[in-house]
């Protein structure tokens, strides 16, 4: 596995890493202007599994992604498997006013065997011909997923992939993400505020509020228990109320 140390790397035992691990994070810490953003964050992600990262606003979820992408300084250890090839799906493009079609946008990245690239992500010809700025929120997210996976990544990082997307368009996006995991074994890390999505699509859950509140198998939690862990008991629905939604 490959080490991506922070500027102040703490002690780390290599025996913690196994060949089946895509990612091992140990004692991760991030500070900004002497303010603690993340503290003593440790978890593992197995190859071919999905991890949902949840927590209150300001809890450090996006900061964690920035550290995993080596975009900010941190302490502790981030250890990726040697096979790692990362794809990143942001909440949105910085600008959707680019005067180009979806096909031109994707060809910029997929320079060989374009037809195979497009087939793998399931984009229809009518979407390929549209301009980026004409796309709906759901269509744009599908294009961003396509952009992320045309290089055959082994890991995909999703930062609120359905933020700003109509409710009816959310499920097809997550179905596509789930199929990538099942069909080609991509490891998925997903930031989401949507507990319904977390409880239906994630294998494991990491709840963050600067520190780790919970890390474990999603099946070990009910929806109500997860809400209680993150927000306190007053926000937890009963299981009956949840299933009525």
For each predicted feature, which ranges?
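Hydrophobic anchor residue at the start of the ABC signature
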Residues: 145
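Conserved ABC ATPase "signature" region
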Residues: 113-127
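H-loop/switch region of ABC-family ATPase nucleotide-binding domains
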Residues: 192-193
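Catalytic Walker B motif of ABC-type/P-loop ATPase nucleotide-binding domains
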Residues: 156-159
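ABC ATPase nucleotide-binding domains
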Residues: 223, 230-245
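H-loop (His-switch) and adjacent beta-strand-loop-beta switch element
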Residues: 205-217
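Conserved ABC ATPase signature
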Residues: 131-135, 139
């Amino acid at each position: 596995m490959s080490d991506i140390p922070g500027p102040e790397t703490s002690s780390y035992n290599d025996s913690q890493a196994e060949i089946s691990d895509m990612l091992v994070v140990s004692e991760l810490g991030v500070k900004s202007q002497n303010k603690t953003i993340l503290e003593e964050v440790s978890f593992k992600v197995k190859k071919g599994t999905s991890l949902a990262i949840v927590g209150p606003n300001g809890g450090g979820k996006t900061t964690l992604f920035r550290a995993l992408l080596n975009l900010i300084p941190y302490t502790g250890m981030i250890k990726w498997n040697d096979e790692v090839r990362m794809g990143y799906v942001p909440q949105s493009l910085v600008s959707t006013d680019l005067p180009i079609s979806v096909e031109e946008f994707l060809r910029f990245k997929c320079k060989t065997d374009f037809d195979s690239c497009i087939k793998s992500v399931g984009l229809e010809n009518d979407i390929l011909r549209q301009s980026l700025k004409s796309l709906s929120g759901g269509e744009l997210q599908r294009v961003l997923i396509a952009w992320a996976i045309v290089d055959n990544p082994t890991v995909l990082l999703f930062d609120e992939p359905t933020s700003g997307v109509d409710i009816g368009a959310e499920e097809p996006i997550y179905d596509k993400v789930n199929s990538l995991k099942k069909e080609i074994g991509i490891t998925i890390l997903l930031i989401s505020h949507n507990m319904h999505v977390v409880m239906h699509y994630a294998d494991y859950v990491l709840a963050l509020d600067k520190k780790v509140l919970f890390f474990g198998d999603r099946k070990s939690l009910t929806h109500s228990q997860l809400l209680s862990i993150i927000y306190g008991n007053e926000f937890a629905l009963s299981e009956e109320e949840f299933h009525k939604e």
